[in-house]
């Protein structure tokens, strides 16, 4: 099978979709012939990239079996291709925000017109599929395939002293909770600081690595609660420092909350943590329910239930054996279920099935 893969978000730009699309472009080549057309220059180039890539795809599509789109925003390209090549297969990955983005123009054309016109949709979680079906995308077109992770690339030989150097504090007799990724409201950091952190043992430190629109609110929550000595905001970090954090923190927390018009499509950050043998405590919400199998690669907690979070975290902090055992199970589970060598093969099977349905 010959796949023409299009990505509007791609390295060297840093981000979750960028990383996933890069991995797809590499790992799919193990099972198929793949040509990638990618925007490598960030959002500023998207207005030029869309007409450019549409024209290129229209000229190239005769030589390929499947047009594979890296996210739902590219559905307009797929729609145009289907008009010109009705017997060619077009499939798109869909993340949560591809369906829930609160813009009437986008909802009218992309969600109600362009996406349903495609031959297949690969949703990154069951919650994303449920949302797609609610949005009237035919259920038979939607396949659920989780995001993948290359476990070996994240794992490293880091020591606690490396973490102390990065954070600039002594960690003797201290526990480190970690959250990484874009600081959006749905991630729940503000809620966690206000409702959970101050109820945890005083020797518990909360580290956030990432940037985003919620930063000011997080700083305000730190000030209001008087927890400045227990919260460290690192901002955006390098891949090296992210890996260091993931390999040395005690517990990874993802305390997501419900936010109208937004959702966690999958939750790749928790899978990156489990790949590094970190126990995870996360909200039993949206795509996190797909990423985490309770008591296998983490613990799922009722969203916005502060006492449930306190109980789960305190138990793990005070029981070294249980914490380490959960981390070991998490790593094994992740390598079995989420390694890219497994996920990429599932993508190829889904693309082959979509191609057969068109013929």
Predicted regions and their residues:
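Conserved acidic donor-binding segment of nucleotide-sugar-dependent glycosyltransferases
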Residues: 293-295, 299-307, 315-321
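Nucleotide-activated donor-binding/catalytic signature segment of Leloir-type glycosyltransferases, i.e.
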Residues: 217-241
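Conserved donor-binding/catalytic core segment of Leloir-type glycosyltransferases
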Residues: 4, 170-187, 193-197
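Carbohydrate-associated surface elements
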Residues: 127, 148
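A short helix/loop element that forms part of the nucleotide-sugar donor recognition site in Leloir-type
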Residues: 155-170
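Short hydrophobic beta-strand element within catalytic cores of glycosyltransferases
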Residues: 270, 274-282, 292
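A short, well-ordered alpha-helix in the C-terminal region of glycosyltransferases
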Residues: 174, 308, 315, 322-336, ...
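Acidic donor-binding loop of glycosyltransferase active sites
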Residues: 247-262, 278
